[in-house]
């Protein structure tokens, strides 16, 4: 039996009103994730939540408090799979706001043994100094991961694929992933972002398999400016990807992060459907 667990990412709820719809409602997301059959949840620590969006601190709000967060998790029998720390990370050094967010995230995660410190690059544009900024991302991510590792945490970097993302293409991956320090930084492949960036999923997983310590699942339609599909209805072969994980004795989380258009209007319903789809299609593979 493999040691693979399934969790849910809060971005599915964040899309409604760009954070406004479910601001300070992490307890609700935890409840729905548990009802959907997921055993974990991955909230965000979004540095710009207050300054740019007018939402609660880090899009955690009251759940910045470890006691409040633990109580909500325990009530619904859901684990904290990790926190996704979202910052630009592209400066010559960490900004004061990034430093504050890093320290907060590490201190919170220390209260939840086994939860992953995920780092995510906030898309910041590709027009100026692309190579320097990509290398800055790798250096800053390694610095954050070293601090996390020194605090007893496991750490993993998650690239994404919006047009303004610094790490979205094969060339970007070759620069940044090859510059990660594997002693402290793993890689979270997001299979939807990989295909949107023009890459094939399995060859990309093969190339960087030594770094994989966390993974995100989202489906891809290829249509429109936000080319996502509800899980199981798009172009990705999640059976094959899950078999790839099992064959390599992967231990950790599969985090479902549905960004399909229908999820904007009904994140609860989509999360429940994702949970059912995983139970019917993927749980037998990892059993």
Question: How should these model regions be labeled?
Answer:
Residues 1-39, 74, 101-103, 113, ...:
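Histidine-acidic metal/acid-base catalytic patches
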Residues 13, 47-50, 89-90, 122-127, ...:
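Conserved radical SAM core fold
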Residues 19-20, 59-60, 96, 134-135, ...:
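Residue-level marker of alpha-helix boundaries and capping positions
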Residues 31-34, 66-68, 72-82, 87-187, ...:
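Active-site acidic/histidine proton-transfer and metal-coordination neighborhood
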Residues 36, 41-50, 82-85:
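Short, conserved active-site loops that position catalytic residues or coordinate cofactors/metal ions
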Residues 42-70, 124-125:
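Glycine-rich, proline-tolerant flexible connector loops at the mouths of alpha/beta enzymes
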Residues 44, 86, 120, 218, ...:
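Conserved residues at the C-terminal ends of beta-strands
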Residues 56-60, 87-95, 192, 230:
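The substrate-binding groove and active-site-proximal loops of carbohydrate-active enzymes
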